[in-house]
Each structure stands twice: as C-alpha cells, then as structure tokens.
Amino acid sequence: MKKILSFCAVLLMACSVNAQAQTNAQQNVSDAKAGQAQLLPWETPRDTTCHEVLLETTLGNIRVALYNDTPHHRDNFLKLVNSGYYNGCIFQRVIKNFMIQGGDYSCRKVNLGKVEKFDVDYTVPAEIIYPKYYHKRGQLCAAREGDDENPTKASASTDFYITWGRNFSPRQMEYYVEKEKREGKSYAIPSAELQQGYIKYGGVPHLDNGYTVFGEVLEGMDVVGKIQNVATNKENNDRPLDDIVITKATQVK
C-alpha cells in the first residue's frame, strides 16, 4: 500500500510540474505577444486616421500606413498608387539585413502593347521628422540622391524602401555607439531613447536624420523578411536574381 501511495504521489507531482511548465510556456507566449504591442514610454500611438496602401507582391502582401505629418510624401505616394504607377514595379535593390527598395521607373515591368506615361521627373521636399520617426525595422522611407548632388535631402519621386536592418543587444548597441564616436560620426549616434527602440525592434540607425520616413508596415513583415533574404546580383546594384514584382498597389483606407 505504501508503495502504491508513493507511486501516486510521484505521479501527481509529475503532473503538477508538467501543468506548471505548460502554464509558464503559455504565459511566456502571452507576454511576448503583449510585449510586441507595448510601446516604449516615449513612443506615441500610431494615428489611426492614416491612409493605408496594400502592396500585392509575388512573395506576398504588405500593408502600409502613411503618416499624416509627412503630407507631401503621403500625397505623392497615394497619387502614384491611384494612377497605377506601382503596378508592375519591382523591388530592384535588396540588401540582406538592411532594406528592400522598389519603385524605380526604369525597372517597371509593363504589359506588351500597353502604353503608359507617367511624369516622374521631379523630387519631393524633405520631411524629416526626427527623432519621432527613425529607421527602426518596418519603416517606409523615401530614397534620394546623395548629399553632394542633393544637399536639401529632397526625395526621389517614386523610389521607396522598407527598412529591415540588424538586431541589437544592449552590448551591441553600446559597441555601435562607441564605434561611431571613434569615427567622428556624432550625427549617427541615436539618443538613449532611440537606442532602446533599436534594441527592441532592430533597424538601421546610421540612416537617421538623412532620409524621410513617411510610413510604416502594418502587416506583412514576414513578406519583407522573405524579400530581404533573396539571392541578389551584387554586381548589378544588388538586384534580385528573380524579379519580385508589385503586381498591384491599392489604397485601402
């Protein structure tokens, strides 16, 4: 009888341990999901009145929101979307652990026999709102010519990129800051608050305060992740070996 009772006690203890482990695992998953939704103390909630655009690509869909406090870029992007310009554009430049870039006029794939004319010979005035908008992972940003040709940092009319960047541990962020200090790049050192943002989200801090960030990815970061992982031709300006096409861009809000 004692042996039976001892066995039952061990069995109950094992069941209790397993149940607690499952509870802890479920709690960890819940905490992780909650953490993704939680903002850092200095962050402000996204403006829910923002216009939204759905980019349907050959690797999946990406839904983006356009910031209202970058109105020139918002309106320009919506104009291009609603004119059909982005239908047939490709992501022509992709760099792993950095960003994916699309929208270049010279790389559009149009249907044979279809005549399309778009006026893209213009720039968009810079709307750099830093540090409110910085280059954390998943930001929609405007490409541009370099500072020598473009000291005002005006954006290209059609080219955009979505950030991916790298993940930072606290020690890696410290190392990054130390490196930028040694190289005299004080302009590339994020504030203490932004350092916490890069540790939480990942991103590309050296682009901060140099390019206009005008939106963010709402859905489809898994697709962005797939795109930034594709094989590319580094001798052809990092163009993917197989074209990744934006088959359709639609304003959905």
Residue ranges and their predicted role:
Residues M1-T23:
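Bacterial Sec-dependent N-terminal signal peptides
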